[in-house]
């Protein structure tokens, strides 16, 4: 065949396989490595090494299934110290939902070649179907909405609200899904005019009741109720936790905010 490189060998094999599949009424679908050496005319590409392969294939007029890192449900979905061992990475629910499968780099005609998305769940770190369910849900629900809903109709806060009903449905069907963590993430945004830090909290919980202190003491059901970002000056020891029916949910989050002249 006069092949000189491994890329030419791969292209030769892919062309042969496409001819074989086409003769039997099938169509070739391959990971984006099949771009190396040239694509057969009717090949569809699965873009898994980021979006670059999908963009290149769509520009050449080939159909594409987008399946980059934002679709790999075998990654950790919360603090690895609290989760079953996984292959690595970090892919929380909101990152899955915020993924947009049609790259901005494509024009309208090229974008028509993006067929959709695929979730990936490699199970070498999952010894049981019980754990497979745990890794798949609720992130698979988020990706389904990404696939089926136009970008201008997707809004995470609204999805988060509607997801509460899906949690009940998953429970009804005895699905071992990941329960949203009670961990609170703390963000400190400097306000240079007032020379303070504006403190805000985010949580995987839906509309949680967050109580906090600014003197280093553990929060109680009578502590300050978080309603939005609040200012703290100098060095401040913040403690915060989620409460439900007067009871603390999980361990308090500790954070030291420090506004000083070097900021």
Tell me the role of every PLM-derived stretch.
Residues 154-263:
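Short, compositionally stereotyped local motifs that mark structural "simplifiers"
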């Amino acid at each position: 065949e006069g092949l000189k490189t491994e890329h030419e060998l791969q292209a030769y094999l892919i062309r042969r396989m496409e001819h074989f599949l086409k003769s039997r009424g099938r169509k070739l679908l391959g990971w984006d490595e099949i771009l190396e050496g040239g694509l057969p005319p009717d090949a569809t590409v699965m873009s898994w090494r980021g979006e670059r392969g999908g963009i290149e294939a769509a520009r050449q007029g080939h159909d594409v299934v987008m399946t980059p890192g934002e679709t790999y449900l075998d990654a950790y979905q919360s603090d690895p110290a609290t989760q079953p061992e996984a292959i690595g990475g970090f892919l929380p629910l909101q990152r899955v939902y915020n993924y947009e499968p049609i790259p901005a780099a494509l024009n309208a005609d090229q974008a028509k070649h993006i067929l959709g998305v695929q979730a990936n769940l490699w199970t070498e770190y999952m010894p049981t179907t019980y754990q497979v369910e745990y890794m798949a849900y609720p992130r698979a629900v988020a990706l389904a909405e990404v696939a089926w809903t136009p970008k201008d109709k997707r809004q995470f806060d609204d999805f988060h609200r509607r997801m509460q009903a899906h949690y009940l449905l998953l429970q009804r069907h005895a699905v071992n899904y990941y329960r949203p963590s009670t961990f609170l993430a703390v963000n400190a945004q400097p306000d240079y005019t007032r020379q303070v830090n504006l403190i805000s909290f985010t949580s995987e919980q839906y509309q949680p009741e967050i109580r906090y202190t600014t003197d280093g003491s553990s929060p109680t059901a009578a502590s300050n109720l978080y309603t939005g970002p609040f200012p703290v000056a100098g060095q401040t020891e913040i403690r915060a936790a989620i409460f439900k029916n007067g009871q603390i949910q999980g361990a308090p989050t500790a954070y030291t905010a420090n506004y000083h002249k070097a900021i």
